[in-house]
């Protein structure tokens, strides 16, 4: 009999993401299953990320992905046909070899990742296992705390806020279903609070479903969030905590950080973070310093790391080499895991395990340009990461992930555990 797990076809196509830009979708077929995956793309990208291949030229304003699609159909597909779909690590290694560059710029990380994820889904479907169980085994049962980005600034918004994301974290909930209800209720109250204060035009939503009101000072969104949490009937800090993504590389100029029109040195910016974390119930800060300011990350981790999670996104770009450097230096204490920053599922999972071994937290994350693909929801549970960052509870591209987590929790009824206040150290 033919091998039911043999890859018989790999087909790529160009589809649209949540911003209306093209992205890559891939189907991987075996005689008994099919796996489909579509890849996201980011607006604020780290310099060291794997390269997303775009066509240039007039079509789609240069953002077409026909070259990446062709690389899958003409170069990758012939090599994969005949391989066993369950050999994820071998397939990912082959994809890396076929590309032959450090940053996947030859075939494109968007082409490679779409194939890598579709292979995993086809294997899970062939084995009749949910994806989280196929990737994580019987120990995958922790539902993550959502870091829900409800107020946008920086490159995600058209306002004057320098920090990019202001998030709420329902750490006091007892289940994921309850957590997402708290987030949704707070989000709707927030909409009302913002509209009352800034007018109804201030509640248009950004790429990730958050609001982008005309705010300038970093304390404004924090004050509004506290008000919304309280008006929704929850206790700030105890039930719903706050998190920030400063995305500092975006406001770093000539050796200085410029926040709300004011210049800060590294030391002064650290003082600002200390002030904010002592005034507001902030439990996590992402990219507090520039992606090459390792010293800044070491300082803030030393000073605030016990109380606050310090997350490296642009700092690490999900890259094991940069993560290793951070661990050795004591820079940050958590990794933001974006599969498209590194380009294969195996490398992303390896980075997560490296972080866990060092006692670092892991936050599985979306990108600002998303699709209806909900793979990261399964990945968060597979890794028992305890945290997921996938936008506000609005826009179907964001809710696709939340809805998948609701389904997973239902499927794991009786064994599912919501990470809650243990989001940083799920098992320790």
Curated annotation (Swiss-Prot):
<dbReference type="GO" id="GO:0006096">
    <property type="term" value="P:glycolytic process"/>
</dbReference>
<keyword id="KW-0479">Metal-binding</keyword>
<dbReference type="InterPro" id="IPR020811">
    <property type="entry name" value="Enolase_N"/>
</dbReference>
<comment type="function">
    <text>Catalyzes the reversible conversion of 2-phosphoglycerate (2-PG) into phosphoenolpyruvate (PEP). It is essential for the degradation of carbohydrates via glycolysis.</text>
</comment>
<feature type="binding site">
    <location>
        <position position="338"/>
    </location>
    <ligand>
        <name>(2R)-2-phosphoglycerate</name>
    </ligand>
</feature>
<keyword id="KW-0964">Secreted</keyword>
<comment type="similarity">
    <text>Belongs to the enolase family.</text>
</comment>
<keyword id="KW-0324">Glycolysis</keyword>
<dbReference type="GO" id="GO:0005576">
    <property type="term" value="C:extracellular region"/>
</dbReference>
<feature type="binding site">
    <location>
        <position position="286"/>
    </location>
    <ligand>
        <name>Mg(2+)</name>
    </ligand>
</feature>
<dbReference type="Pfam" id="PF03952">
    <property type="entry name" value="Enolase_N"/>
</dbReference>
<dbReference type="Pfam" id="PF00113">
    <property type="entry name" value="Enolase_C"/>
</dbReference>
<dbReference type="InterPro" id="IPR029017">
    <property type="entry name" value="Enolase-like_N"/>
</dbReference>
<feature type="binding site">
    <location>
        <position position="389"/>
    </location>
    <ligand>
        <name>(2R)-2-phosphoglycerate</name>
    </ligand>
</feature>
<dbReference type="GO" id="GO:0000287">
    <property type="term" value="F:magnesium ion binding"/>
</dbReference>
<keyword id="KW-0456">Lyase</keyword>
<feature type="active site" description="Proton acceptor">
    <location>
        <position position="338"/>
    </location>
</feature>
<feature type="binding site">
    <location>
        <position position="313"/>
    </location>
    <ligand>
        <name>Mg(2+)</name>
    </ligand>
</feature>
<keyword id="KW-0460">Magnesium</keyword>
<dbReference type="GO" id="GO:0004634">
    <property type="term" value="F:phosphopyruvate hydratase activity"/>
</dbReference>
<feature type="binding site">
    <location>
        <position position="368"/>
    </location>
    <ligand>
        <name>(2R)-2-phosphoglycerate</name>
    </ligand>
</feature>
<feature type="binding site">
    <location>
        <position position="367"/>
    </location>
    <ligand>
        <name>(2R)-2-phosphoglycerate</name>
    </ligand>
</feature>
<dbReference type="GO" id="GO:0000015">
    <property type="term" value="C:phosphopyruvate hydratase complex"/>
</dbReference>
<dbReference type="InterPro" id="IPR020809">
    <property type="entry name" value="Enolase_CS"/>
</dbReference>
<feature type="active site" description="Proton donor">
    <location>
        <position position="208"/>
    </location>
</feature>
<protein>
    <recommendedName>
        <fullName>Enolase</fullName>
        <ecNumber>4.2.1.11</ecNumber>
    </recommendedName>
</protein>
<dbReference type="InterPro" id="IPR036849">
    <property type="entry name" value="Enolase-like_C_sf"/>
</dbReference>
<dbReference type="InterPro" id="IPR020810">
    <property type="entry name" value="Enolase_C"/>
</dbReference>
<keyword id="KW-0963">Cytoplasm</keyword>
<feature type="binding site">
    <location>
        <position position="245"/>
    </location>
    <ligand>
        <name>Mg(2+)</name>
    </ligand>
</feature>
<feature type="binding site">
    <location>
        <position position="164"/>
    </location>
    <ligand>
        <name>(2R)-2-phosphoglycerate</name>
    </ligand>
</feature>
<dbReference type="GO" id="GO:0009986">
    <property type="term" value="C:cell surface"/>
</dbReference>
<dbReference type="InterPro" id="IPR000941">
    <property type="entry name" value="Enolase"/>
</dbReference>
<comment type="pathway">
    <text>Carbohydrate degradation; glycolysis; pyruvate from D-glyceraldehyde 3-phosphate: step 4/5.</text>
</comment>
């Amino acid at each position: 009999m033919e091998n039911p797990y043999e890859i018989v076809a790999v087909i790529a196509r160009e589809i649209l993401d949540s911003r209306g830009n093209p992205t890559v979708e891939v189907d991987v077929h075996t005689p008994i299953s099919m796996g489909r995956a579509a890849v996201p793309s980011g607006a604020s990208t780290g310099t060291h990320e794997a390269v997303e291949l775009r066509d240039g030229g007039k079509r789609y304003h240069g953002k077409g992905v026909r070259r990446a699609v062709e690389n899958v159909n003409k170069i990758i597909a012939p090599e994969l046909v005949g391989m066993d779909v369950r050999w994820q690590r071998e397939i990912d290694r082959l994809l890396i070899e076929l590309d032959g560059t450090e940053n996947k710029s030859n075939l494109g990380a968007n082409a490679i990742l779409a194939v890598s994820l579709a292979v995993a889904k086809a294997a899970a479907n062939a084995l009749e296992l949910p994806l989280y169980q196929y990737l994580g085994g019987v120990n995958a049962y922790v539902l993550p705390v959502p870091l829900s980005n409800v107020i946008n600034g920086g490159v995600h918004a058209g306002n004057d806020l320098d920090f990019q994301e202001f998030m709420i974290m329902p750490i006091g909930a007892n289940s994921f279903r309850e957590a997402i209800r708290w987030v949704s209720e707070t989000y709707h109250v927030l909409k009302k609070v913002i509209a009352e204060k800034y007018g109804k035009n201030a509640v248009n939503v950004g790429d990730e479903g958050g609001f982008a009101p005309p705010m300038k000072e970093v304390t404004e969104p924090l004050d509004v969030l506290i008000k919304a949490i309280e008006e929704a009937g929850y206790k700030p800090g105890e039930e719903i905590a706050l998190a920030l993504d400063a995305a500092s590389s975006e406001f770093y100029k000539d050796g200085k950080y410029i926040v709300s029109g004011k210049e800060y040195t590294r030391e002064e910016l650290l003082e600002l973070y200390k002030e904010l974390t002592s005034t507001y119930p902030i439990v996590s800060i992402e990219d507090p310093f520039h992606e090459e300011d390792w010293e800044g990350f070491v300082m803030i981790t030393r000073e605030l790391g016990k109380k606050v999670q310090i997350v490296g996104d642009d700092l690490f770009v999900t890259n094991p080499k940069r993560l290793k450097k951070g661990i050795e230096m004591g820079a940050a204490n958590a990794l933001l895991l974006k599969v498209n920053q590194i380009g294969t599922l195996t490398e992303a999972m390896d980075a997560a395990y490296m972080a866990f071994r060092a006692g670092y937290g892991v936050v599985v994350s979306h990108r600002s340009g998303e699709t209806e693909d909900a793979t990261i929801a399964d990945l968060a549970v597979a890794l028992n990461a305890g945290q997921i960052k996938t936008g506000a509870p609005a826009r179907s591209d964001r809710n696709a992930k939340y809805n998948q987590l609701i389904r997973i929790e239902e499927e794991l009824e009786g064994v599912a555990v919501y990470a809650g206040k243990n989001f940083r150290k799920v098992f320790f």
